[in-house]
Amino acid sequence: MIKKIITTVKLALPAGKATPAPPVGPALGQHGVNIMMFVKEYNARTEEQKGSIIPAEIQIYEDKSFTFILKTPPASILLKQATGIEKATKAPRREQVGSISYKEIQNIAKIKINELNTKDLSKAIKIIEGTAKNMGISVET
């Protein structure tokens, strides 16, 4: 028998360090989900990716059970890790905070391609380049 989905909740949480405190508690508690069960399962599945923010898409069913899918970290997080910067710039056209090689952009595009609006690698690279430029990161060809 197919369970009926009552809602889908999207959360971006630190890998291996989720707690029942906000934002997890309020987001799942209002739907009657066992919060500790989610936290333990999420932390177990993201243990090897500590230090990253891993988005999770949680489907909550009528019987208060749930399933969740882990996504790849946001492109901005991957770009920050690749360049070693803490924060993006507030004025991307005027201020550069770092630089990244085209090869690193390609690697990030390969990681993110399944979650982007394209299946073409060259277009995925352009999307990641655009994100980098908007963060104040110059792309070295």
From Swiss-Prot:
Pfam families documented for this protein: Ribosomal_L11, Ribosomal_L11_N
NCBIfam families reported in the protein's UniProt record: L11_bact (TIGR01632)
GO terms (BP aspect): translation
GO CC terms: chloroplast; cytosolic large ribosomal subunit
Protein name listed in UniProt: Large ribosomal subunit protein uL11c
Annotated gene: rpl11
Biological classification of the source: Eukaryota, Rhodophyta, Bangiophyceae, Cyanidiales, Cyanidiaceae
A GO term, aspect molecular function: structural constituent of ribosome
Intracellular or extracellular location(s): Plastid, Chloroplast
PROSITE patterns in alphabetical order: RIBOSOMAL_L11 (PS00359)
Superkingdom: Eukaryota
